[in-house]
Each structure stands twice: as structure tokens, then as C-alpha cells.
């Protein structure tokens, strides 16, 4: 049993450390812990916090920008719809105005054409009447000249016959003038 006690004592002797070594280990651990805490952990924690804040601010800014972009897109879509409606209304109004203008222009052109036709017909009637009166005057003048020549020839032969022919001729001229006046009045 002695052996057993001694071997157990040797076994436990190696397990229980020396107090000085244990104290030095604890002190070195504390120094290392403090060193790591102040020089590694805290700066790393600050850097991670700054980085996290930086990323979070960018995420928030991105979300805010997306919301603003959606609002602007909605506004743009609304303005686009309003512009399309305005263009459609403007197109319809311009077509109505153009059709109205065309109708007015057609009406004016038709009225002007009718007026020109009426004036042209009046001018033609006046010209026709003028030509007729000139024609009748030429016929009368030619007839008078023929009669005068005939009468001059007959004057030598028979003065009485000449006077009766002149009287008849004057009557005939008056009838023709009256009939031409009647025709002129009838033609008008």
C-alpha cells in the first residue's frame, strides 16, 4: 500500500502546480488579456462599429434613395400620363379646329366661286348685249348705206319713189330698234 500511496502522491504532485508559477501565469494572462483588450479588441470593436455604421448609413441612404426614386418614378409616370392626355386633347382640339377651318374655307371658296360665276354671267350677258347692239347697229348702218346707194341710183329715176322708200326705210329702222330694244329688254 505504500507503493500505492506513493504513486498516488507522485501523480497528484504533478497535477497541483507551483503557487509562484500559477501566480505568474495568472498575471501574464491578465497582462495579455488587458493588452489584447486595449490594443486589439477595442480598436477592432471601434473599427467594426464604424464600419457597421458606415454600411448601415449607406444601406439607409440606399433605401431612402430607392424610396425617393420610386416617388420620382411615380411622379414621372403621372407627368407622362398627364402629358399624353394633354397631347391627346391638343391633337383632338387641333383636328376639330382644322376641320372647322377646312369647312369654313370650303364654304368661303364655294361662296366666292358662286359670286365669281354670277359676276361672270353678268359680264357675259352685258358683253353679249353689247355685241348684239353693235351687231344690230352694224346691220342697220349697212342697211342704211345700201339703202342710200340704192336711193341715190333711184333718185335719178324717180324722186317720188325715193321719198316713199326713205319713209318706209325709216319706219323699218324704228321697228328694228324697237324690236332690238324689246329683245334687249327680253334678254335681260
Curated annotation (Swiss-Prot):
Keywords: ATP synthesis, Cell membrane, CF(0), Hydrogen ion transport, Ion transport, Membrane, Transmembrane, Transmembrane helix, Transport. F(1)F(0) ATP synthase produces ATP from ADP in the presence of a proton or sodium gradient. F-type ATPases consist of two structural domains, F(1) containing the extramembraneous catalytic core and F(0) containing the membrane proton channel, linked together by a central stalk and a peripheral stalk. During catalysis, ATP synthesis in the catalytic domain of F(1) is coupled via a rotary mechanism of the central stalk subunits to proton translocation. The gene is atpF. The keyword Transmembrane helix applies. The keyword Ion transport applies. It is found in: Cell membrane. This is ATP synthase subunit b. The lineage of its organism: Bacteria, Bacillati, Mycoplasmatota, Mycoplasmoidales, Metamycoplasmataceae. It comes from Mesomycoplasma hyopneumoniae (strain 232) (Mycoplasma hyopneumoniae). Coiled coil: none annotated. GO terms for cellular component: plasma membrane; proton-transporting ATP synthase complex. F-type ATPases have 2 components, F(1) - the catalytic core - and F(0) - the membrane proton channel. F(1) has five subunits: alpha(3), beta(3), gamma(1), delta(1), epsilon(1). F(0) has three main subunits: a(1), b(2) and c(10-14). The alpha and beta chains form an alternating ring which encloses part of the gamma chain. F(1) is attached to F(0) by a central stalk formed by the gamma and epsilon chains, while a peripheral stalk is formed by the delta and b chains. The chain crosses the membrane at residues 19-39. GO terms for molecular function: proton-transporting ATP synthase activity, rotational mechanism; proton-transporting ATPase activity, rotational mechanism. It is a single-pass membrane protein. It comes from the Bacteria. Belongs to the ATPase B chain family. Its main location: membrane. It holds the Pfam family ATP-synt_B.
